[in-house]
A protein has these predicted regions:
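Loop-helix junctions at membrane interfaces
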Residues: 2-207
């Protein structure tokens, strides 16, 4: 029991170290290297959150993931390509390390969520994230979640893995509902908090 507690403490510590590095990465100039570094660190945090901060549901092999609130934040900060990479790489490596095989249907859903949320970030803009922008974000992420887990994941499950339609769509609907709620609450909080660290253009006055 003590070993498990120590293990989780170490994991939390490592996540905070990665977040600190991400903060430094954000200050780098907008280059391809910056995005690759953000993608790699984001994928590592994705795996930790998926493995240790997942909430079980009554539907088999389906959990509620706080991970996607983090993916939404990263996609808003770094754009669609980074969101896509974190979703794809993070979910793939998490499947391999946790289950020994990759469910490409759910990898595709995670990757699409990151990609689409990145484009949503370009429309909504992270600066001054409040009021109408929060409403647009929530509406957008609900639509993206529905496409990701009620359309993409079940259809690929049925087409490639020959999963029963009822089971595939039950898993998809459960995941979509859970993820859209988590992202609407925690994702909004994370993006709002981050937006407060950004200095708006024209907000600095010359002394």
């Amino acid at each position: 029991m003590l070993f498990l507690v120590e293990k989780k403490v170490i994991l939390v510590y490592n996540v905070f170290k990665l977040l600190k590095i991400l903060k430094e990465v954000r200050l780098m100039e907008a280059t391809a290297i910056k995005k690759v570094v953000a993608m790699g660190i984001g994928a590592a945090i994705y795996i930790v959150l998926s493995r240790f901060v997942a909430i079980p549901t009554p539907i088999p092999n389906t959990t509620l993931q706080v991970t996607f609130a983090f993916v939404a934040l990263m996609a808003f900060i770094y754009g669609p390509a980074v969101g896509l990479g974190i979703g794809f790489i993070g979910h793939t490596l998490n499947d391999i390390s946790g289950y020994g095989n990759v469910w490409f249907s759910w990898v595709a859903a995670a990757a699409f969520f990151g990609l689409a949320t990145g484009f949503l970030g370009k429309i909504v803009k992270i600066e001054n994230f409040n009021g109408a922008k929060i409403v647009k974000f929530i509406v957008g992420e609900v639509i993206i979640s529905l496409i990701s887990w009620v359309v993409l994941a079940p259809i690929i499950d049925i087409a490639i893995y020959k999963e029963p339609q009822g089971k595939a769509f039950a898993q998809g609907v459960t995941a979509a509902l859970g993820n859209m709620i988590v992202v609407a609450i925690l994702g909004t909080i994370l993006i709002f908090a981050f937006s407060k660290t950004i200095v708006s253009k024209g907000s600095l006055k010359q002394e």
